[in-house]
């Protein structure tokens, strides 16, 4: 069992730590206002936390007139966080400071269908290597956040009937990693972590938004009233299996015409292969000849170079995802939709096709102020979100492993 440095703090002190984490460099006055504390109470609590080494002063904020306020942050000397982003075909692991700055990071190909034993054994090795690279040992890890591409029972840290990774069903990632680390370990769906990452970047300034990840699969992270919404069984946001064509191809879930089988990365690759082999695109035929296969990125590159067949593929994928998204926009009425995952490397034409489809199909009231854009955190959204999960939940459980 791990005991965090803050395990014996009062409720008010814990509130201050949480607020400091989410404000990412707020002032004493700002903390007092957010928490409804008097200035004298906030100053006394902050002074105590600085003295105990929990908080640190981090320079001055820009002046808005008058004396420049001092910024506060969690003391990086307390320890580090570990973020793990398990993708369907990739693995990212990072050691992060308490301000979510990346201290060390590694990314490599991985095949989630190899099963949890193979993938998580590699995760163990990479975490150890990164900690050594940072000159740290396991005792400095305050929390570990893990994202996986499937539904998760959040309380148990287990996957539940994950379509892309059936061998992981009911496997406890938490128990596996606990053999090496006493720090609390938290597991969530990968797109939920992307949503958490954006929520932290925004300092919770947006309360209702969506994050759509398009890669090997398609998923959605839902932020409702400033919190990630997971649903009754952890499967909220599994939008990849919304039907967009009843006569479409069969999905791996068993149904026909799911948007995932028609517009995700493998579908884009399949359409590109057909165009190359059918003589519709010389550019993609050349790529196929040179590489033996075509990646979604290659389609994007051909599209940006003006290849008509590539443009048609990108627009079709964007239009189908926009068709799916329009229903969700009508239902949920988000202020923003952020799109992430490997699809972002395809370029602006895909985003334009998504926007056009959503605005055409959604109610005017739902789209009047809607913004649709690529996720500003880019490829690191999942890792940052894993760090947010680790810190947020470690503070919630006071560092005691659940």
Question: Residue locations for each model-derived region?
Answer:
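Phosphate-binding/catalytic loop of phosphoryl-transfer enzymes
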Residues: 83-85, 98, 142-270, 385-402
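ATP-binding/phosphotransfer module of carbohydrate and carboxylate kinases, centering on a glycine-rich
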Residues: 1-60, 64-140, 181, 246-247, ...
């Amino acid at each position: 069992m791990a005991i965090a440095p803050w395990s014996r703090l009062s409720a008010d002190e814990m509130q201050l730590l949480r607020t400091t984490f989410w404000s990412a460099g707020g002032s004493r006055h700002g903390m007092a206002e957010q928490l409804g504390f008097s200035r004298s109470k906030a100053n006394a609590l902050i002074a105590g936390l600085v003295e105990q080494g929990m908080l640190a002063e981090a320079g001055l904020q820009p002046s808005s007139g008058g004396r420049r306020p001092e910024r506060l942050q969690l003391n990086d000397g307390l320890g580090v966080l570990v973020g793990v982003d398990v993708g369907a075909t990739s693995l990212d692991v990072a050691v992060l400071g308490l301000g979510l700055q990346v201290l060390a990071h590694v990314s490599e190909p991985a095949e989630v269908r190899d099963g949890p034993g193979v993938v998580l054994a590699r995760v163990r090795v990479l975490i150890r290597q990164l900690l050594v690279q940072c000159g740290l040992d396991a005792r400095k890890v305050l929390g570990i956040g893990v994202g996986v591409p499937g539904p998760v029972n959040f309380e148990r840290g287990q996957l539940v009937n994950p379509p892309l990774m059936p061998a992981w069903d009911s496997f406890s990632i938490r128990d596996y990693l606990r053999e090496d680390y006493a720090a609390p370990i938290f597991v969530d769906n990968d797109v939920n972590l992307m949503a958490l990452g954006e929520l932290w970047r925004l300092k919770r300034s947006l309360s209702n938004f969506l994050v759509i990840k398009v890669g090997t699969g398609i998923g959605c992270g839902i932020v409702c009233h400033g919190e990630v919404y997971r649903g009754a069984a952890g499967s909220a946001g599994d939008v990849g299996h919304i039907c967009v064509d009843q006569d479409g191809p069969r999905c791996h879930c068993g149904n026909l015409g799911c948007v995932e089988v028609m517009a995700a990365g493998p579908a884009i690759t399949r359409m590109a292969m057909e165009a190359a082999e059918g003589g519709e695109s010389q550019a993609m035929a050349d790529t196929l000849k040179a590489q033996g296969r075509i990646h979604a990125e290659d389609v994007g590159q051909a599209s940006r170079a003006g290849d008509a067949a590539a443009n048609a593929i990108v627009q079709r994928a964007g239009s189908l995802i926009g068709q799916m998204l329009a229903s969700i926009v009508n239902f949920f009425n988000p202020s923003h939709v952020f799109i992430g995952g490997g699809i972002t490397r395809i370029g602006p034409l895909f985003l334009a096709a998504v926007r056009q489809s959503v605005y055409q199909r959604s109610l005017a009231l739902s789209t009047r102020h809607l913004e649709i854009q690529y996720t500003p955190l880019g490829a690191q959204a999942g890792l940052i979100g894993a760090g947010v999960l680790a810190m947020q939940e470690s503070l919630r459980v006071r560092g005691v492993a659940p």
